[in-house]
């Protein structure tokens, strides 16, 4: 019995070390996407330089000064990445030398998007705070400015996803 308990403790320690950053690779799946991205917000240093793979849709973000950022994102529950109290997007600003497919149905609340599979790294733990105009329903509210926070993602591989029927547009815990 004691030997079984020791083996269980060793196994649990190995699992905990893997979950706490001992991995050199993070494959974000439908089940782990939200948890890993949330953890990354609090402990980005453990992900810097590590290989990360994930599926997302393309999203063009424009700040209040007109600068555009191409992002790979998913939609998620309120509270992640902004203080707006509304549902928001979760993902990265994509740094890629190749062509990133153009967003599709960006302003519509639908899963009919331009989906891509990405592999790359988080080059630094520095967050970009981007000031954007708020949305009021389906319209932009130019009187209200919100701040969203993103990390950069150095893309080493980008593959368009033709059939995204198995992917959730909206991710949650």
Could you describe each region identified by the protein language model?
Residues 11-12:
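Repetitive helical segments and hydrophobic/amphipathic motifs
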Residues 8:
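Segments that form or flank anion-binding pockets
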Residues 1-4:
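Positively charged n-region of N-terminal signal peptides that target proteins for export
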Residues 15-19:
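C-terminal motif of bacterial Sec signal peptides marking the signal peptidase cleavage site
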Residues 20-173:
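OB-fold and OB-like single-stranded nucleic-acid-recognition modules
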């Amino acid at each position: 019995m004691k030997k079984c308990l020791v083996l269980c403790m060793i196994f649990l320690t190995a699992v905990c070390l893997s979950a706490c950053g001992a991995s050199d690779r993070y494959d974000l799946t439908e089940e782990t996407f939200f948890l890993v991205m949330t953890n990354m917000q609090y402990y980005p240093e453990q992900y810097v330089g590590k290989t990360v793979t994930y599926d997302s849709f393309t999203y063009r973000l424009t700040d209040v000064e007109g600068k555009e950022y191409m992002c790979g994102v998913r939609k998620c529950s309120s509270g992640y990445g902004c203080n707006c109290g509304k549902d928001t997007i979760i993902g990265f600003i994509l740094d890629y030398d190749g062509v990133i497919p153009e967003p599709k149905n960006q302003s519509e609340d639908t899963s009919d998007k331009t989906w891509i599979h990405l592999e790359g790294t988080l080059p630094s733990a520095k967050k970009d705070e981007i000031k954007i105009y708020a949305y009021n329903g389906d319209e932009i509210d130019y009187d209200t400015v919100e701040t969203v926070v993103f990390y950069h993602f150095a893309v080493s591989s980008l593959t368009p996803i033709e059939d995204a029927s198995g992917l959730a547009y909206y991710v949650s815990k």
